[in-house]
């Protein structure tokens, strides 16, 4: 007789590019989100929780022109109805695209301007790498329906407050601001957007090479090239603005093929940051010359700087920096990026700046996809996981998660008494649990408490019960004594105390307070 086939067991493993989070990681993220939400709420923003699933049509971004729209997103097609094919659905890849759909769908019921914040996981169907996962948290705040740059200034100020609220000290970060309109002015100057170059006197000597218009494809190459400034550096960008560059493997990446004069103008824009915001603005005005859109962008930066200064957000926290180019192909006006300025050791032991932890800007075209009308909007997205990594790197987060007080079980028949103890502790706001494993071996109960990183264990056997007392073991002090104390010190610093049963809560609270754990 043939043996029945065994049912194959599934592999217990996470999918590639995903990970699980435990204990302290979850608690620390929740606390950080709560602190950021507190700042958003203080600024008058309302919470929004939208669906994690959107139609592919509503998302609209990262989607290739192919039958299955799954590049960049996790997408699937619903079953077809009798009269039409099933809709394509996808997990959201950010929190901004859902906001555009929500505003377009509910705009008649929402205040104008609409100020909202949202927090939650997003999913990207991209190649994972070290520290780069396919699911991660975003924490956004946006104002929809306000065209004034006062909304952009407010977002920048709020971003500063958020960073300080989670433990990033002033001096350890800087919020850098640029404006897509200024870049448009630069492109206009070099013949990308206008029929004739409009140069300031400083650039008149370049005029003979600036007259021809560039194609839209070439403009796209220019935008993608300057977006790589952080990765390639100035010389790498200069090469890609010209004929191209070879990477370390020798492969050639074709460039925008600009003339030297055109490249010089673009590089002057990227290098226009002066010693003060005022100097930077002067440099930018000279570069954009008589370009209307360029001048408008510089004026907006100047106004933002004035508004921030009025609120005591000076250049020690927020600076105008034309080298902020990330996302300029997406945004339509001011852009901003929060960068941590302190140094850390990377995985290979090399010293480097931590880098960007938040970014945002003005995107006046996003809602237009749904309504056909331009709706001004501006906002910021904070990378919560990167912020947590930064605080870990600075040693400002305790990597251990303090466990609950453990009430041990010395007598199975008296479980009700132990439950009464733990109930009293919980009612006093103290995290506590009864040991629910096999109580036969008391040593295993203490090992369990150690595994849980418990600060205190409560012990009450038959003798203690008759006397009306409990034994309270300070596990933190006990561990310290076990590491270094002599016998005499151990006698002088006992880590276990006998107290009347009625004083259980008071004694536990006293021990927690001694270790800075009482809240």
UniProtKB/Swiss-Prot annotation:
Gene3D superfamilies: Anticodon-binding domain, Bira Bifunctional Protein, Domain 2
Keyword 4Fe-4S: no
Top EC group: ligase
Location in or out of the cell: Cytoplasm
Biological process annotations from GO: histidyl-tRNA aminoacylation
A GO MF term: ATP binding
InterPro entries on file: aa-tRNA-synth_II, aa-tRNA-synth_II/BPL/LPL, Anticodon-bd, Anticodon-bd_dom_sf, His-tRNA-ligase, HisRS-like_core, HisRS/HisZ, HisRS_anticodon
EC number(s) per entry: 6.1.1.21
Broad class of the protein's primary localization: cytoplasm
Signal sequence bounds: none
One Pfam family linked to the record: tRNA-synt_His
Keyword terms of this UniProt record: Aminoacyl-tRNA synthetase, ATP-binding, Cytoplasm, Ligase, Nucleotide-binding, Protein biosynthesis
GO cellular component terms given for this protein: cytoplasm
Reaction equation(s) it catalyzes: tRNA(His) + L-histidine + ATP = L-histidyl-tRNA(His) + AMP + diphosphate + H(+)
Superkingdom in the source lineage: Bacteria
Family of this protein: Belongs to the class-II aminoacyl-tRNA synthetase family.
Entry-linked PANTHER family: HISTIDINE--TRNA LIGASE, HISTIDYL-TRNA SYNTHETASE
Summary of subunit composition and partner proteins: Homodimer.
Name by which UniProt lists this protein: Histidine--tRNA ligase
Species the sequence originates in: Roseobacter denitrificans (strain ATCC 33942 / OCh 114)
Gene expressing this chain: hisS
């Amino acid at each position: 007789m043939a043996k029945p086939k065994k049912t194959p067991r599934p592999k217990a493993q996470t999918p590639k590019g995903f990970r699980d989070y435990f204990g302290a990681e979850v608690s620390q993220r929740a606390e950080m989100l709560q602190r950021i939400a507190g700042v958003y709420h203080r600024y008058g923003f309302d919470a929004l929780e939208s669906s994690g699933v959107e139609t592919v049509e509503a998302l609209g971004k990262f989607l290739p022109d192919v039958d299955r729209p799954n590049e960049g997103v996790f997408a699937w097609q619903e079953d077809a109805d009798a009269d039409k094919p099933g809709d394509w659905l996808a997990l959201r890849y950010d929190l901004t695209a859902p906001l555009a759909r929500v505003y377009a769908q509910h705009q008649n019921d929402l205040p104008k301007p609409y100020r909202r914040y949202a927090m939650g996981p997003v999913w990207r169907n991209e190649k994972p790498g070290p520290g780069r996962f396919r699911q991660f948290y975003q924490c956004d705040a946006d104002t929809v329906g306000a065209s004034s740059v006062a909304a952009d200034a407010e977002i920048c100020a709020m971003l500063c407050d958020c960073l300080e609220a989670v433990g990033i000290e002033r001096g350890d970060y800087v919020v850098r601001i640029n404006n897509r309109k200024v870049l448009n002015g630069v492109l206009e100057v070099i013949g990308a957007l206008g029929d004739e170059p409009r140069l300031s006197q400083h650039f008149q000597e370049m005029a003979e090479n600036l007259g021809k218009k560039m194609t839209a494809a070439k403009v796209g190459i220019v935008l993608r090239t300057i977006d790589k400034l952080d990765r390639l550096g100035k010389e790498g960008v200069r090469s890609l603005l010209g004929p191209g560059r070879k990477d370390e493997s020798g492969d050639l990446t074709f460039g925008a093929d600009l003339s030297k004069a055109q490249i010089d103008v673009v590089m002057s824009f990227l290098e226009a940051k002066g010693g003060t915001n005022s100097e930077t603005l002067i440099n930018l005005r000279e570069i954009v010359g008589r370009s209307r859109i360029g001048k408008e962008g510089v004026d907006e930066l100047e106004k933002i700087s004035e508004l921030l200064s009025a609120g005591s957000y000076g250049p020690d926290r927020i600076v105008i920096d034309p080298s902020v180019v990330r996302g300029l192909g997406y945004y339509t006006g001011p852009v901003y990026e929060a960068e941590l300025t302190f140094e850390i050791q990377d995985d290979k032991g090399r010293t480097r700046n931590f880098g960007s932890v938040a970014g945002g800007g003005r995107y006046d075209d996003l809602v237009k996809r749904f309504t056909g009308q331009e709706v001004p909007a501006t906002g910021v997205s904070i990378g919560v996981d990167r912020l947590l990594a930064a605080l870990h790197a600075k040693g400002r987060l305790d990597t251990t998660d303090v466990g609950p007080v453990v009430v041990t079980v010395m007598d199975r028949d008296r479980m009700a008494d132990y439950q009464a103890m733990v109930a009293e502790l919980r009612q006093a706001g103290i995290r506590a649990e009864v040991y629910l494993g096999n109580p036969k071996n008391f040593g295993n109960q203490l090992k369990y408490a150690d595994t849980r990183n418990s600060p205190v264990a409560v012990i009450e056997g038959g003798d203690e019960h008759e006397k009306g007392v409990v034994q309270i073991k300070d596990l933190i002090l006990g561990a310290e004594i076990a590491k270094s104390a002599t016998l005499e010190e151990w006698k002088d610093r006992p880590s276990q105390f006998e107290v009347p049963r009625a004083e259980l809560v008071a004694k536990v609270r006293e021990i927690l307070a001694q270790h800075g754990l009482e809240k």
